[in-house]
């Protein structure tokens, strides 16, 4: 099976969402009569203000697969609480054999992250973050691990509510 790693492409549609295609794989199904070729596309969509979603689409042709992936990503969007263009706190994410470490960074640091993780942060609108991946570098697993870490983000107000304290007590 051949694999095509597509260049990350960005799109800005009229709905204000940022779209990035992370990868397109050529897949093959072997049947009695021969091989059936198809394509699988992986995309991320975000609003530049903390909302992000991932989608995977499969079809016989690339444009159809990408369109399906974009639509699925739009349906799967969720909000991540950001603080001044970076994350609230350091967090680990895991999916399959991929593990990622996501850490907030000071202003001026930029997005220090590899491939698929960078695409997620770009569409989300994160300006400063440090991310490190361990284990599998499969784009699908890396994106899922990154989103797992982002879902674990919590604000000081969330933590204060869980502990039954005020935000001032939590922040010291």
Swiss-Prot record:
Domain-related comment: The N-terminal domain interacts with the head of the 30S subunit; the C-terminal domain interacts with the body and contacts protein S4. The interaction surface between S4 and S5 is involved in control of translational fidelity.
Residue span(s) of domain S5 DRBM: 17-80
Keyword Ribosomal protein part of the UniProt annotation: yes
PROSITE patterns linked: RIBOSOMAL_S5, S5_DSRBD
Name of the protein: Small ribosomal subunit protein uS5
Organism: Paraburkholderia phymatum (strain DSM 17167 / CIP 108236 / LMG 21445 / STM815) (Burkholderia phymatum)
Keywords of this entry: Ribonucleoprotein, Ribosomal protein, RNA-binding, rRNA-binding
Bilayer-spanning residue ranges: none
Any one of the GO BP annotations: translation
Assembly, per entry: Part of the 30S ribosomal subunit. Contacts proteins S4 and S8.
GO MF annotation: an example: structural constituent of ribosome
Record family assignment: Belongs to the universal ribosomal protein uS5 family.
Origin: domain of life: Bacteria
One GO location term (cellular component): small ribosomal subunit
SUPFAM superfamilies: dsRNA-binding domain-like (SSF54768), Ribosomal protein S5 domain 2-like (SSF54211)
Role played: With S4 and S12 plays an important role in translational accuracy. Located at the back of the 30S subunit body where it stabilizes the conformation of the head with respect to the body.
């Amino acid at each position: 099976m051949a694999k095509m790693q597509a260049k990350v492409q960005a799109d800005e549609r009229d709905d204000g969402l940022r779209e990035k295609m992370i990868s397109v794989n050529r897949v093959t199904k072997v049947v009695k009569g021969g091989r059936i070729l198809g394509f699988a596309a992986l995309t991320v969509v975000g609003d530049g203000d903390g909302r992000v979603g991932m989608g995977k689409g499969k079809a016989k042709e690339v444009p159809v697969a990408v369109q399906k992936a974009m639509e699925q990503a739009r349906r799967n969007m969720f909000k991540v609480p950001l603080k001044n263009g970076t994350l609230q706190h350091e967090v680990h994410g895991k999916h399959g054999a991929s593990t990622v470490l996501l850490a907030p960074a000071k202003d001026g640091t930029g997005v220090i992250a590899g491939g698929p993780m960078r695409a997620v942060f770009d569409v989300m609108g994160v300006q400063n973050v440090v991310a490190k991946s361990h284990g599998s570098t499969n784009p699908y697993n890396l994106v899922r691990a990154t989103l797992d870490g982002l879902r674990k983000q919590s604000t000081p107000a969330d933590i204060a509510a869980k502990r039954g304290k005020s935000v001032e007590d939590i922040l010291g």
